[in-house]
Amino acid sequence: MSRYRFRKARSNWPMGQNDSRWEPPPVRLNELVTATEPEEIPLPKLEDQPYEGGPLNMTGFMYHPRTKKYYKMTQDPTMPQGFSKSDLDRMEKAREAKFQANRPRFTSGSFIQRPVFKPITTLMDDLTLGRCTMARVERHIHESRLLNCNPKPSFTIKTPIEHYDVSGCEFLDVSETGDRIVGTFTVNPNGVAAKHSAVYVFEVDSIGDTIQSESSRREAYQLLPIRSRSNNAGFNTLGLTVRPMLRDDGFSDEPSYLDYAVTRYNSFIVDQTLARVDADVTCMLTVTANDTITRNGNVCSYCTVHLEPLAELSDPEAMPTLNSPIYNKSWREKGNIWSVGWNAPQMSIGFGLESCFRVENLLTDRSFLMSSRKRNVLNHCFSADGNLVYMGLRNDNVIKSDLRMNRDHITGQLNGACNTTFVRVLEKTRPECVVTEGFDSIIRIWDFRWPKNPMMEMHGHSNNCNRLNVFFDKEERFVFAAGSDGYVRGWSLTSGDMLCSVKTPNHSNPIFPRAVYSDCWGGRPGNSAIIMAVGDSMRVHSLEL
């Protein structure tokens, strides 16, 4: 026996009187060993029992305190999945990263984070510490207001046209000061007169006493129990009053309500826009269409462009000059006129025709034609200096034409901007960029220096081959569009995110809703709201932090 095997064999021998090194023999198979003390299984403590929700109060999850994991409650208990708080945070970050990766971005690479609601204290701290500028603080405040937009209107105002039944709104705009609303409404007289369209100018005022009384009434209503609250018509916390501006000259014996309307049209309205002819006078450009039967029995279509002054939006000192021929003109065109636009620097009017584009000078009465690639000019707009015109064509891209050239006016196009029904230049913020909207239900921001791809895309809009209402605020921070599905949506022109989506009542008439936005309604800064003209009412959605 080797020395190693001998040491291993005697390792279990008892060594003298010391039994500490002695090891008991191993238990053999099927040998019974009597236990000296019974084994007791300790019960789990009450604080270690799993319970629903956990510290995060997550519905649908069970929380285990010992493992610190969340288990999703399912109908099949054999397939549980445990998630810790770090797992949930990681999943949320992955979801947010995927969402940010799929968002449209600027082609230059610069990108601003998705707007979220920020308290005033956080914004002021960032401003004090120099982490943001004052312009960004203002933008965050307005975006937070839009993010808090309630789908239900704060209150509803019946369109103040007492002697007619209003069918819908065809045009709506607001002044920069927020104290005037210009609208074209389709009205049905109560008498024997036929259905027609009328232009009205409303005065918007904000009354302080109404603000205090309505705010107190809303606070008392919110203190009531939910079951005790009755249906109310809303709370006019902005103190808004909308009244028509009467045109009573004092010489007519007829009632003043007959002169409510600025003008009336018995023909179909194709397009309308406001034209600031000079610093004192504001006019309205309107395109109407009607059909006539010739002597041979053929149906012939004619379009007429009307230029009419709006005394309510003009300077009171310019009243004696409103009857001047330069402010009251009309042009009759055989064929279709799809769009009309005003070029203020050159005092000219643009007509989007069936197969070309026409420019009419208001001072010299001279006109010339420009190529539109033999396409219908669905919409157009002029640049801030008046030298360029951007045209949205049917079945073709948006083109840019230079008015200073004698021939070959087309100098550029946007690849992918097809069937564009709305074109607008961002004159105040980005004069080199245009915003387009078309039949593909996508609102895009383009730069003609990089015409192959848009700078930004805003999704969620709905358009089914209609010319819909698109509105910009005076600071060009937001864009609002009424969709063919009855929703009015708003996007941020800085980040491209949708900030609000409001569903309007579904009416049987084919007139789509119109929406305007202002942050100084009634001439009071801070009165921020969206007004939607739907049917015979104006739905006011007040925006609060």
Curated annotation (Swiss-Prot):
Q: Which stretches of sequence are listed as region Disordered? A: 1-25
Q: Where are the WD repeats?
A: 417-456, 460-501
InterPro entries listed in its UniProt record: CUL4-DDB1_E3_ligase_receptor (IPR052254), WD40/YVTN_repeat-like_dom_sf (IPR015943), WD40_repeat_dom_sf (IPR036322)
Q: Identify the keywords attached in UniProt to this record, alphabetized.
A: Repeat, WD repeat
What cellular component terms from Gene Ontology apply here? Cul4-RING E3 ubiquitin ligase complex
Point to the regions of Basic residues compositional bias: 1-10
Would the keyword Ribosomal protein be found if you checked this record's keyword annotation? no
**Record keywords: Ligase included?**
no
Q: What is this protein called?
A: Uncharacterized WD repeat-containing protein F47D12.9
